[in-house]
Amino acid sequence: MRIVVKVGTSTLAYPTGRLNIRHAEELVKVLSDLKNEGHEVILVSSGAIGMGVGKLSLPARPKDTTTKQACAAVGQCELMYTYDRLFSAYDHTVAQILLTGVDVEHTERRVNIQNTLTRLLELGALPIINENDSVATDEITSIGDNDTLAAIVACCCKADLLVLLSDIDGLYTAHRPRRLCQAVRLGQEGDRRKRSSRQVRRERHHGRRYLVRYDQLR
């Protein structure tokens, strides 16, 4: 089975931007186990800007574009270093792919992305994809968020399953206005699977506002 997994900044890092080592190790352990079972895994990972904030010891997440780009450049190195180190412990090789809106909109580039992903999976590597926040700054070059990027990647590589991981406490059964929505707490595993197609809109401390489909890796 070919699986695309997306993980966000709020899952990987603390509000300070520092890496949540326990969460990162648990994620890598689960994904490595999936690969050991014979599944093809692609990881779409946020976290570059947040980790850049921590690495540069900034007091807060910057608001200006240039500093955000600088944080993304620094944080992406830290992010990939962490993934490479953790996956190496399970004898898995990772590969970095950074994309922009231009890459996914342009037909020839999209085909190149598909070919690269296919070959990496054939070689047994685990592709790790992120939006190239160091250069993607406007409506033309920016994809918007990594939930959208994960969906694009899943379609591009003809994935069998798309999993969007989140640390939210519950799900809404409908869109806004919220007074018309029923708040559903996450229950037992069976309930989670049954509700996997429902969507939630929630804003986290480092993430953008996004739509999430909850599912499980097991």
How does the language model describe each region?
Residues 1-217:
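Nucleotide/pyrophosphate-binding catalytic subdomain
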